[in-house]
Amino acid sequence: VIPIVAPFIDISVADGVLAAMDQLRGDRVTLVLHTLGGCVTACVLISNALRQFRESVAVVPYMAISGGTLIALNASRLEMGRYAALSAVDPMIMGQRVRHLAELDSDKSVAALAREYEVAMQGYLRDTLRAHVPEARL
């Protein structure tokens, strides 16, 4: 069992989780998530590593918000507490939601970067959801 109990998942948290995964014997892993999310890169690294296990379980006793939701959805099984919560995966750049930055008229380069980022994240999420949701519902 690998706990991810952190208000913010950053690269150092991801490094610790990946190191713990490397130490596991076998092809099973269980993550316990209690987080508000964090750095998209860190969450994607953990998600990609989670996909490498034949059997993976994400346990969410209370909350796995944004990037925590992304990680939880990449497990082959999700177990949630009675009052647990997931949320939208809502990436941010410079403290602003990507979807809002993509609409900026004042800074075209930031808006273009945000649109590119948003398209990439939507593709990643679509691939993640394909494992759990029939194609027709995506």
State where each predicted segment sits.
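Terminal-region recognition feature
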Residues: 1-138
